[in-house]
């Protein structure tokens, strides 16, 4: 997600 840089 947008708030998860590790997954994006």
Curated annotation (Swiss-Prot):
The modification Phenylalanine amide is found at residue 8. Disulfide bonds: none annotated. One of its GO terms (biological process) is neuropeptide signaling pathway. It is found in: Secreted. This is Morphine-modulating neuropeptide B. Coiled coil: none annotated. It comes from Bos taurus. Modulates the action of morphine. Its main location: secreted. GO terms for cellular component: extracellular region. Keywords: Amidation, Neuropeptide, Secreted.
């Amino acid at each position: 997600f947008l708030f998860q840089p590790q997954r994006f």
